[in-house]
Amino acid sequence: MPCTKEAQLRHVGYGRFYMLVNRILMALTTEQLLKELHELKHDADLEKWLASTSSSVVTLHAYLDFLLKKSGFKRAQVCRDAHVDATFGYQIFQGTRGASRNTLLRLALALHITLYETNVMLRLGGCNALYCKEKFDAIVIFGLDHQRSVPDVNDMLYDHNLPLLEA
């Protein structure tokens, strides 16, 4: 049996998906994609480029599923730890409902994921990435780095007179 999380994910059949997620994690910027597009010469090149870029699109719910499998946590436990209603959490994980930035941040804390993974999740959810110059975001980043719980992060936010992660 493979020993690293990455190898285990590949072993259980997540190879293609893992590669797509890695492409997102490598953060192909709009500028890079635009540069590639400008360099195309022929219609056939455009067709190939469109096929390659559309196949690299990962949805929020697919990424959440990937993170869930990577973490080894159960969806119900993540929802509980994130203080997200089980039905609403299930809908987010299935892709039938969207989530606010704060809800995604609570899920990130419950999943114990990295700042980088959190920012990818936020971008896929149509939200702004965490920005360390913002007090609120800096506290959340600290919580992510130190695997703090949602109540712990809320306490830190409260101590600094900032809005809480929970509505």
Language model features by range: what are they?
Residues K5-E6, R16-F17, N22-A27, E31-L34, ...:
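Short, charged recognition helix plus adjacent turn
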Residues K74-D81:
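Short alpha-helical "recognition helix" segments of helix-turn-helix
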